[in-house]
Regions:
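Single conserved hydrophobic/aromatic residue that forms the stacking wall/gate
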Residues: 221-232
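Terminal targeting signals and extreme-terminal segments of soluble enzymes
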Residues: 1-223
């Protein structure tokens, strides 16, 4: 089973009622003993699109409220609005009677849209200043064996050479580098879908957010379906 197929399997949720689902988090997508935030986003994203009448999330936000353990979770979906062109709702991730995470999203049907595409933008200049062959595989095991989180092993992640902080000499002047991490992300075996994008949104260091809120990292993602690559 390839990476893409494993990811899709890890998102399989069991329906208990019209708007309630259960899942045992897949430990391949953990950070230590807790599920990775991007994986949780993808799981809640899947639950939302399973309930709302529109198939594709066009905007979403997530709040991490409490720690989640490697135990069964319940996903409760509430519909806010269901219109002709869009619908919206919220997913509450519950464990041991605690609401641990919420995911709010608005959905539409991209596959039915026609006409001018005004969303396409050019790639950032940084993707042209180094050849892709110069990018470095994300591997924290070079610091300490076993330090690379399990979720990183579920995809290919190549970091821009200027952002490979773990390979810098200890006496390097860090002020000469931007506080950013640009990378090519690839989940071999399939074309990136909307759930991959939710997963990718919390892949690259620094951590985007935790239960205390956003940590000030601005993300920009593009995807190239032809080579199964997400670039962030």
């Amino acid at each position: 089973m390839n990476h893409f197929e494993k990811f899709q399997e890890a998102l399989e949720i069991e329906q208990k009622s019209e708007n309630t689902f259960t899942l045992i988090p897949n430990t391949n997508y953990f950070v230590g003993n807790t599920p990775h935030g991007g994986y949780l986003m993808a799981v809640m994203h899947r639950a939302l699109t399973n309930v709302l009448p529109h198939s594709t999330a066009i905007s979403s936000s997530v709040q991490y409220l409490d720690r989640i353990d490697p135990e069964p979770i319940t996903l409760e979906v509430e519909t806010f609005k269901a219109g002709r062109g869009s619908s919206s709702g919220i997913v509450k991730l519950i464990q041991n009677n605690r609401v641990c995470t919420t995911f709010t999203g608005t959905c539409s049907d991209f596959n039915h849209m026609k006409g001018f595409d005004g969303l396409e933008t050019a790639l950032p200049k940084i993707f042209n200043d180094k050849d892709k062959s110069d990018y470095v595989a994300l591997n924290y095991d070079e610091i300490t064996k076993g330090f690379t989180p399990s979720f990183i092993h579920q995809l290919e992640c190549s970091i821009h050479p200027d952002h490979v902080w773990w390979k810098r000499e200890k006496d390097t002047d860090s002020s000469q580098y931007d506080a950013r991490c640009s990378a090519y992300l690839k989940m071999g075996g399939g074309k990136p879908d909307q759930f991959c994008l939710s997963f990718y949104s919390d892949i690259l260091p620094p951590v985007v957010c935790n239960k205390y809120g956003a940590l000030g990292c601005c993300l920009l993602y593009t995807s190239d379906a032809a080579d199964e690559t997400g670039r962030g």
